[in-house]
Amino acid sequence: MQTWKKKLVVSQLALACTLAIASQANAKDISGTTYNTFGYDNTASTPWYYGYADWDYSDATHDGDIYPVINKSTVNGVISTYYLDDGVNGRANALSISNSTINGMITSECMTTTCAEGVDTDGTTHTQYDRFSLTVDNSTINDTYEHYAYDVVNGDTTETHYLDTYGLGNAITLDVESDIVIQNNSQIAGITLTQGYQELDNTPYDGVEGVANSSNIFTDTLVVKDSVLTSGAYSDLGTSGFYGQTAKPSDYGETNATAADDAALIVAASASDNAMQTTATFDHSTVTGDILFSSTFDNNFYENGDPATDTTEDGVYNPTTNGWDGTDKLDVTLTNGSKWVGAAQSSVEAIGTAQMYGQGYSNVDWHALSPNSIWPDSTFDSNGHVAGEEVYQSGLFNVALDNGSEWDTRKISNIDALTVNNQSQVNVENSGLLADSITLTNASTLNIGDSGAVATDSLYLDSYSRAALTEETAELYANTITVDNGAELALGLGQVDTHNMVLTDGGVLNVASRDYVLNSDLNNARYITNDSHKADYDYGVVALNSDGHLAVNGDVAGNYKVRIDDATGAGSVADYKNKEIIRVYDNNADTAASFTAANKADLGAYTYQAQQKGDTVVLQQEELTDYANMALSIPSANTNIWNLQQDTVGTRLTNSRHGLADNGGAWVSYFGGNFDADNGTVSYDQDVSGIMVGLDTQIDGNNAKWIVGGAAGFAKGDISDRTGQVDQDSQTAMIYASAKFMNDIFLDSSMSYTRFNNDLSATMSNGQYVDGNTTTDAVGFGMKLGYDWKPNLSGYVTPYAAISGLFQSGDDYQLSNDMRIDGQSYDSMRYELGVDAGYTFNYGGEQALTPYFKLAYVYDDADNNADINNDSIDNGVEGSAVRVGLGTQFSFTKNFSAYTDATYLGGGDVDQNWGANLGVKYTW
């Protein structure tokens, strides 16, 4: 049993002195009915009150009106729980409301003259024996009952009188120790919790025992699950309206609303002898309205020392003590996706360290009084100068968000500690937030928007959490900002002021595109070594875009990785190379900072990374970007396709001179190959496959036998390097001729027209996809002069010299990331000296097999440059190479044959890892 005694304070219920009780024989089960708590029958001068929740027992001084289990009911008026706590075993101090609507409120106050000022009908002081338990399940308590209107008949006149109830509180107003559960889609219009009972300290001070403190704590618990809590109303909302419509208690932010009218939860700890501590948990619920917390020092606490200890009346307090105080507390937790829109406002009393003498008294249980909080306005010494921040507060108000919950602040909020955990978020816009400390963990966010302001002694961002200032009018001030373990402070467009910026374990200061001056010290949490391979290595990250700049005015120490976040295809080398992005103004010889590159960024045609040069950090140029590399590789890769087509036609003409007689005919050939290219600037890997079909005939004339024909080629290529990719399509039309003279000298020649279509794609350093396409027209030629030396009728050895060239027109185009490619004309020449050797095996005159071998020296000459963003970049490939090949031709009949060969070419800027063609021909 709790021996709480009713405090001697004036009741807030003005109507308690006007209502009469309507006594009934027993408590009524009103479940399934509509019930009115007020009534009037014109026989009495005041209305009757039927609203007590009570147990039915015969020896009670009060007979109950409502059985304390209400289900599927509609109640109009005010329900009082005052008489539920009777101290009798078996009768719980509990009220359960389910599947019901209460058009009004629940209060723990006395509602009639029979118990005014906390004195029951038997003359004893009302006490709280047991904790009160309130369960609201799938129900609504809307605080809409503002008046009881009743008609009074006076002779021939009927007058309407009003009994005001709007000032009694909001939907749930309790001054007793309570455990409240609101669940299952319930809707409550405001909750007020006050401290109505206390257990007294042993007073007054007697010089021997002192004051024996009562260590009892007045506690309340509130759990709101899967439900809605809104603001209630303390004002008469019926005195104003808009087009005939008055405001509802649940309306938040109304023009005429008082602070109490906008409150969803009010917790008021009074100057009793005991502390009041409340926990409020919102689980998967919505709160719309302010949460107000007020606290004063306990009754026997003296800010400047207890005068009762001056037993000698000489003005000296002996011992010097503040007396007794228990810290009031309100802990609010939002969890599992709960959302709160409103302000958190705290009103407490505090003393500085100079006023802290101790608690308790000598020879009893004296102990020193110590600070329990800090004060934003600071503490001062006797000369009026700032002495510190530590204070002893009468109460503490803490807010925690967990598991994806959200708080959208309104007005001006001031609390002690704010913790934001597990992907939860706090949004401050057109409002302010003052907190002693703010901590974000596990990917949580603090967003400061338009006209939003946040001030704190310490802001701690941890484990990939993020604080961002999204508008120019956003402000953040903190004496110390710590960004830890991959978390990020994004300056955005707002203003950040601090004395000490700590970036540790990969914590990020994101400057973006700002030209920002940080007037603060910058350091790591632990600066021990610059060796990144050691376990105690610590570092922070400074993130910028290429057009951003950070200047630091303060002592700078520690290790920092500089990350370039943006990527673009626009801009020339002059726009980026050696551009300053960080400058440190630190004249302290005892501090040193190391800046290293965190990444490479695609800017224009090249990648860049950060490089420290003394007190500055600049952009250092590196290799080509993937998309620029692909764009510059396209002409060379086009040439590779064309060279394979030249080889395919060359094989057709070579085979016409060996094996069975060839008078011309129709042929078709598959060709393919794989290439690796690297000229020190561009590099790529290429796969090619295609088909050629041709038709030719033999003509005699001019002391030679001529084969003259035409061919069409179709090929697909795939170019790749890192994230770069090009899909190629080509179509070729070619005419060719081969003349074999009587002295076994031959001359092969060809002319061609080719159209190349290339679709380019890549991923930039920031993950952005980029693409583009280009179409190129090209003309080419080929000539091969050789001598067919036949040591016998079956064998041959053919030395030869060849020249070929492809001339591609320039196609100016732009990629999706704004990189411009101009002047892409590309000329390629190939010179070749080699020898072919083979032997023909005849089988019965109409079948023959001719295996052969190739060996050649090849020189490629493609000295070309391309303009990208007005910078000329070498994309030519050249160099000497060796070609080695093997092949065979088999004649099934004198008219039908098949052939195949494979070659390798390596040594120059482009290596052909393999090339092959497989064909068939039908001769006339």
Identify the function of each model-found stretch.
Residues S270-D273, T279, T288, L292-T333, ...:
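Extracellular beta-strand/loop-rich repeat segments of large surface/secreted proteins
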Residues E623-L793, V797, T903, G908, ...:
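Outer membrane beta-barrel translocator domains of Type V secretion systems
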Residues M1-A27:
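Gram-negative bacterial Sec-dependent N-terminal signal peptides
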Residues D156, D251, N256, I634, ...:
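Solvent-exposed, glycine/polar-rich loop segments of beta-barrel outer-membrane systems
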Residues H367, R514, L518-R526, S532-D547, ...:
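Outer-membrane translocation/initiation segment of Type V secreted surface proteins
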